[in-house]
Every structure is written in C-alpha cells, then in structure tokens.
Amino acid sequence: RPSLSGTLAFQRINLGSIMSALSPVGGENGTTLDTTFTERLNLDLRLSSTEATAGPIAMTEVAATAQIRDGLAVFDISDARAFDGSLQAGLRFDITASGVEMGTSVRATDIDGGALGSTLGLTRAVPSSRGSFSLMLKGPVERWDHVSDGLEGTFSANFGKGTLVGVDLPAFLKRTSDGGFFSLEDVSQGTLPLDRLDLQTTITRNLVHVDRAELVSGQHRVQLSGLVSYIGGGLALSGSVATAAADSGQAAPGARFFVGGSLSEPFISPQTSPQ
C-alpha cells in the first residue's frame, strides 16, 4: 500500500480539518466508525505552522504530528501557544480485533483563564486568572453519537489569584442562613475576588465525579464534591463554606448546602449542620 512521509510548514492551518481526516467516521449519518482507512495508507507527517485554528481556538507556534498505519491513527499537537500560555493535545485511535479504542488528552499550562472562558463561552466557570488544566480520556468507541459512553479518565485544574464573575458570596451566605432552597441565579450578580481554585475530578461513562473542588477567597473557603452528568447536565453536589477567624486563621464551620438541578439551572438547598 502507498506510504507518505515528510515535513510540512504552513503560515496558517485549520487543525480541525486534519483531525477530522484522521477520525474513523462512516455510515449513512456519519455516526458509525469506519476504520478501513488505516489499512489503505501509511502516513507519517511532521507539521509546523505560524498560526492555526481548531474550532474557536486560535494558536501560534504550532508543532504537530499525524500518523496512520495498520490499526492506528494518531494526531498530536506536541507544542503550541494559546491563551497566552502553552498547549498540548492528542487524539488516538487503536483498532484491534475487539473494536476501536479512543484516547484523547489536552494539557494547558500557565494560560489566561479569562481568555479561555471568553472563547468557549464559559466566563462563569473559568476564573479570570492564570492557571493550568489537564484532561485525559480513554475507552472503547462504537458510534460517534455515543462517543462518551465508554470513556474514562481525569480532569484537573488549578488557577491562581484573580476573579470569578457571577458569584455574590455575601448574598449566597445570607440566603443559606435564611434557609429554603433558591436558584443560584439569584446570587449571581457579583464578582468574587479569588485567591486560588483547585479542581480534581474522575470521569466514568458520562459522569464527572468531583473528588475535590476548593475555592479560597479571602477568609472564605468553599468546598464541593459529588456528581455531575454531562449528558443532561444533572447536578448532585454537597458543599460547604468555612470562614477563617482573623486572629487565629483557623477555619470555623460555616454554611453547608446541596447543589441540585442542572448546569443550566442549578439550585441551592441549605443543609443543617450536625450537632
């Protein structure tokens, strides 16, 4: 079968088109996986580009590789500049007798969270501060319309001093003190000064297990754990807000609450602290 190898340099390139070309899409609706393309061509390319795009994401100084051989298709961005930081990403398909296994990863280091949030429409979820994140997923794939069903992995993020829009913490604490459930939208008219934000999650079959989420703002420490479904966006999270005493710095027990509803319409239900 034919083989193609070499090095290509571009001024500007659409990386989304390359990733689509290396993805095993087939069927009448483009939902089933057609892996026969890995049997028809051997490919080994080194790519570089001064500028590049992948959907809404703009990158510069891109170095990437594309490989196809029997039973394997790989696209790796080994280095790129994005959101005023560095970015690496990869997409891999391993084809075996038992099926197709997909692996994907994204690692961003020392990026501008505000720029990331604006680009992806996540200004309320991503702080305006410097930070890093890592996403790794792997698992069997049968159809594109159910691509996430078998994927498992981790997502973690760490952001430093900055701000988080859409959070009025004093109003939130007052509502939890008053009792009765309320919509998070009711206490979203504010901007929260942020000292740091740390997030660690485990992903299994369309569920995000929030193992640890901690936000520190001045004397307040907000913690969350629980489940988030990214099919439907359902929420089941337990949280607390502790306040450190000014003289000792020790955190005193504070508000406890449950977060339910969905990502688009979360609600808060205050919880009674155990005696």
Question: Model segments located where?
Answer:
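Membrane-proximal interfacial segments on either side of biological membranes
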Residues: 1-76, 82, 87-192, 203, ...
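Short, intrinsically disordered low-complexity segments
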Residues: 195-199
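Extended serine/threonine-enriched, polar tracts that run as long, contiguous segments within proteins
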Residues: 201-210, 214-221
